[in-house]
């Protein structure tokens, strides 16, 4: 999801 990546990068990608 959008909050999965560090500092809401790109859908955890």
Swiss-Prot record:
The keyword Secreted applies. It comes from the Eukaryota. Keywords: Neurotoxin, Secreted, Toxin. Transmembrane segments: none annotated. It is found in: Secreted. GO terms for molecular function: toxin activity. GO terms for cellular component: extracellular region. This is Scolopendra 4511.92 Da toxin. It comes from Scolopendra angulata.
């Amino acid at each position: 999801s959008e909050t999965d990546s560090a500092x809401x990068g790109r859908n955890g990608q």
